[in-house]
Amino acid sequence: PNLKSRYLLGRRAAKRTDVAQKLIGEGKFDQVGYIAPLGKMPFSEQTQSSKEGLVSQMSKMKEVIEALKQDKTSLVAICGMPGVGKTFLAEQIADQVKFEKLFDEVAKANLSQIPNTRTVQDQLAEQLGLKISEETDRVRAERMYTRLSNGEKRILVILDDVQEEVDFKSLGIPVRGECKGLKVILTSRLSHVCSRMGAQIFEVGALPKEEARHLFKEVVGMSDDSTLSDVSDQVADECKGLPLAIIVVAKAFKSNHTTPESWNIALRQLKKYTMRDIEGVQDLVFSSIKWSYDHLESVEAKSLLLLCSLFPEDYSIPFECLVR
C-alpha cells in the first residue's frame, strides 16, 4: 500500500470532518443522523462452518458460562499456554452472556506484564461510565467498589493477561461473594497464580487435529476436496493445534502460495524455525510468527511491523507515528 497517499487522504478526511462538525454546530438542526454501528454477532449466531470448527471452544465456553450462573461462583480463570485462545474465548463469553442477558454490563481491562492500578481502573471506568480521573487512589478504589457493588446491574469484569496476583482491594473490585451481581473472569497462562486467588480454573488446551485442520482451511478459504488439501493438513499439523499459530500461518499461505510446489517448499521452511529459552514464548508460536514475518511481501511491511514492536504492549499506536 502507498502510505503517503493514505496519510494525505486521512488528513483531507480529518479536515472535512472538522468542517462538517462546524457546520452542524452553526446550524439549527433538531437532529443529526448517523449510521448506527453494527453490533457484534453473538457466538450462537455465527456461521455454521465456524461453529463446526470450534467445537472444543464452544464446549469450554458453555462450561464457563454455567459456572458464572452459580451464585457461589464469583471468580473464574481461563488458563492455558500462549496462543491457545484465552482472550478470544473470554471475549466470546462476554458477547454470549450479554446476548443471553445474563449480565447488563461487561468491562474488560488488559493487565499485561507490568499492571498499573490506575491504568486498569481507567480502562474499566471508561466502559462503565464512571469518572474517577481526578481522585486520589483511595477515593478511586471506593468509587469503583461502589459502582460495581450497588446491586442495580449485573456486571461482568474481564481482567486479561494476568501474570501475578491481583490486588482487588486497590482496584476497588469486590470479589469472593462480596457482591452477587458481580462476576470476574481472569485470563492467564499461570494457573497456579489464579488458584492462589481462589479462582475456579478452566484449562484451555490445543485444538484437536481435525478442528485445527478445519480452522486452517477456513482461514485459507480452501475446500476439503482441493488439490492442496493433503499438504494443507500437514501445514496445519505443524501448528500443533494452537489457534494463533494456525491463523498466522494460514493467512501467510493464503497470500503467498498457490501451487503444491510452493506449499511444500514453505512447509519445509516452517519446520526449520525454532526459538528457545525465552520466557513466555512457546517455540511453536514464535516459529509461526517468524515464518509469517519472513514471508511478508515487502521490506516496507517488515519495517512497519518492526516499528510497531517497539511500542509497549497493548499500546494504541498513532497512525502518524508510522508514516513520519
Please tell me what each predicted stretch does.
Residues 1, 43-44, 50, 55-56, ...:
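P-loop NTPase nucleotide-binding module
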Residues 157-159:
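Hydrophobic residues in beta-strands of the RecA-like P-loop NTPase core, especially within AAA+ ATPase
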Residues 19-84, 88-97, 101-105, 110-113, ...:
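N-terminal flanking helix/linker immediately upstream of nucleotide/cofactor-binding cores
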Residues 1, 6-16, 20-23, 27:
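Amphipathic alpha-helices that form helix-helix packing interfaces
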Residues 163-171, 195-198:
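Conserved ATPase-coupling elements of RecA-like P-loop NTPase cores
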Residues 118-127, 180-234, 248, 265, ...:
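Alpha-helical sensor/transducer elements of the RecA-like P-loop NTPase core
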Residues 21-35, 116, 175, 179-180, ...:
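Proline-centered turn/helix-capping motifs that create local helix->coil transitions or kinks
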Residues 26, 79-81, 109-114, 162, ...:
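Structured beta-strand/turn binding interfaces of compact recognition modules in eukaryotic regulators
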